Regions:
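Hydrophobic membrane-insertion alpha-helices, especially the h-region
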Residues: 4-21
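A solvent-exposed interaction/effector surface
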Residues: 17, 23, 36-39, 43-47, ...
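Ser/Thr- and Asn-enriched, surface-exposed coil loops between beta-strands
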Residues: 80-83, 105-107
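Extracytosolic and intramembrane catalytic regions of membrane-associated proteins
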Residues: 83-85, 96
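Short, well-ordered beta-strand elements within core beta-sheets of diverse protein domains
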Residues: 29-36
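Short acidic/polar N-terminal linker immediately downstream of export determinants
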Residues: 23-29
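A structural signal for short, hydrophobic beta-strand segments that form beta-sheets
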Residues: 71-78
Length: 310
């Protein structure tokens, strides 16, 4: 019997020793996620505006004041340039945590969600605190995974799916005209017809859809350039001009809808370029997929918006 008691005592001593050896007085809990997103986009959706948290939070929430996840309620309590301070609250505790931004390069960041626990001197409390820390670390990881999935989706960030492509039709037959208001569809397609007539007259071929760029000169005057990609360069009269695009890179997005939706696409590409610190060497333009003169319902118009970049 004494031997059994002695063995139990030794086991207890070993267990307690192991607890003190393996669980430090201060337990740091961190989860790190590498996210392919720009610093600007992260700030917009995570730091600058609390309402954007609902868009990526994995459990349903109607408010950003208290974000529930499993057995915790997460509450944003403070923010600065790179850190969001968040209280993780359950029935027993309020744990103060930090969400830290660590930029790596133009389009990649690390996000660290971290906190620390004082485990005390009581072995039982140490084990309980360790289990609590392990659970919270799992929550951090799951929440960061949800954030990563959202932030790496360009369509979620910019409202359009943005892709990179190359200039395939560098040679253009173009013409410009000015109007006192935004050009009408009739005015645009009048010039497109003139270009098409010249293409037939000169016995050359179209290699792509009509292209359009409208520039506001002042509050009531616009300059419009219309172009059609062609297969070879020949001479035209002064009303028409041959333009040569640089064989470089383009951003492109598909747009469905009229002028207002197309302008939103231009704005989204402007923001994308700013976020990714790109430079545009030439003017953006839209490619007219739908023949707008034949389709009066602008909600059915299909276009592509292109932005040259390097």
């Amino acid at each position: 019997m004494k031997k059994i008691v002695a063995v139990i005592f030794v086991i207890i001593i070993l267990l307690v020793s192991a607890i003190y050896l393996l669980i430090p007085a201060t337990l740091i809990v961190s989860s790190i996620s590498t996210i392919n997103v720009t610093e600007n986009a992260y700030r917009k959706f995570i730091i600058d505006n609390n309402t954007n948290w609902q868009k990526w939070w994995p459990s349903f929430t109607t408010t950003t004041e208290n974000l529930n996840y499993k057995n915790y309620q997460f509450k944003i309590i403070n923010k600065n340039i790179n850190v969001v301070e968040i209280a993780a609250i359950n029935d027993q505790d309020t744990i103060y945590t930090k969400l830290i931004l660590a930029p790596l390069k133009t389009d990649t960041i690390n996000v660290i969600w971290t906190t620390h626990f004082s485990t005390g001197s009581n072995p039982l409390k140490k084990v309980q605190t360790y289990q609590k820390a392990k659970e919270l670390k799992s929550h951090f990881t799951e929440l960061l995974n949800s954030m990563k999935k959202f932030l790496e989706n360009d369509e979620a960030i910019y409202s359009f799916k943005i892709e990179k492509t190359k200039v395939n039709d560098p040679l253009l037959l173009s013409s410009k005209f000015k109007t006192h208001n935004y050009p009408t569809t009739t005015e645009i397609y009048k010039v497109i017809k003139e270009l098409k007539d010249q293409i037939v007259l000169k016995d050359i071929k179209e290699t792509g859809n009509p292209m359009l760029h409208v520039r506001m000169l002042d509050s009531s005057n616009y300059e419009t350039m219309v172009a059609i990609p062609i297969n070879k360069e020949i001479l035209f009269d002064n009303k028409f001009a041959i333009k040569k695009m640089i064989l470089g890179n383009l951003l492109v997005t598909d747009v469905k809808g009229g002028v207002a939706n197309i302008q939103k696409a231009y704005d989204a590409l402007d923001t994308y370029i700013l976020d990714h610190r790109l430079i545009s060497p030439a003017m953006p333009y839209e490619s007219l997929i739908t023949n707008r003169i034949l389709e009066s319902d602008t909600s059915k118009w299909e276009s592509k918006v292109y932005y040259p970049i390097f």
